[in-house]
Amino acid sequence: MIALGSDHAGLPLKLEIIKLLEERGLAYKDYGTTSPERVDYPVYGRLAAEAVARGECERGLIFCGTGVGISLSANKVPGIRCVVCSDCYTAVLSRQHNDANMLALGARVVGVDLARMIVNMWLDAVFEGGRHAQRVGMISRIERDYLKEPGGPQDPAAEQPGRQR
């Protein structure tokens, strides 16, 4: 299952990629938006990323104007490794070397044909493991270290507005 998300700017490209997923017979869940009305990309990047992080979806494809804002939002969710790609080489290596579990595309940056090629190659690429697994593990340790920091999500004081340390 592939999680999908977009803001209004990314919606037309997301709809084109949905056609590609259907052609390939791949299951997906669309976390929105489904409207061309202006919306905030962090909402939809987070929803799709949380589905991937929870294991409800194996990978995610997200879209906004540049791919940058929605990828930044997704990458705040622990366990997410989202990359912005506008070329096939980076897309393939993001899977092979970095085990990227989400791909962000900018609808104002890549055209439909290039986006289809990027998505196809990203979906087909396989994580190589080996020395790359060690590096991905190092990235995960950095993430875990910051989650333990005061004020992080595991800190009970972080849930109490106005409380200072």
Give the ranges of each region predicted by the language model.
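Glycine-rich phosphate/diphosphate-binding loop of Rossmann-like nucleotide-binding domains
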Residues: A3-E23
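C-terminal binding/interaction regions
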Residues: A3-G5, A9-G10, C88-R165
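Short amphipathic alpha-helical segments
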Residues: L15-I18, L72-K76, R116
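Acidic, glycine-rich active-site loops and adjacent beta-strand->loop/helix elements
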Residues: T34-S35, G65-V68, K76, C88-T90, ...
